[in-house]
Amino acid sequence: MDKLKIVPFNTDYIAAFEKLNREWIEEYFIMEEEDLMTLQNPESYVMERGGEIFFAVLDGDVVGTAAMIQKSKGVYELAKMAVAKNLQGLGIGKKLLERCIDYSKERGATEIFLITNDSLKPALSLYLSCGFVLNEQNDDNSSK
């Protein structure tokens, strides 16, 4: 993983952002309209709203991605985080998450939140290990 680089948004990587996220969303859930709009229009749904999308690049290939969406002044949402299935468990997600947290703190974030589902156990474990806390259990079985 020495060759792994975490890089900011690049229009060349838009297709990878959609592909990596589509894979996990369609495997575990039903693609919702808001998800589809974000995946197909990341510039208007993330970048133009004061957010950032990071990419994990290994040997020239995008192998992971995560978005920080500014929700309001000082409040950011971690969203659309994905790592290529064959490379999960190798620390790529943690590196992406750490970069996202750093990005938000650099911009004065006072709150960073995410919405997840308890069926995504490895992801939930990662979030908890990086300092996120479980605040609420919703009827739809998602946590934030």
Predicted regions and their residues:
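Conserved GNAT acetyl-CoA-binding A-motif
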Residues: 104-116
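Active-site acidic-Proline motif in GNAT/NAT acetyltransferases
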Residues: 84-86, 90, 118-119
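Conserved catalytic-core motifs of GNAT/GCN5-like acyltransferases
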Residues: 113-118, 124-144
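Residues forming the Rossmann-fold NAD(P)(H) cofactor-binding site
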Residues: 94
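Acetyl-CoA-dependent GNAT
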Residues: 4, 8-79, 84-86, 97-99, ...
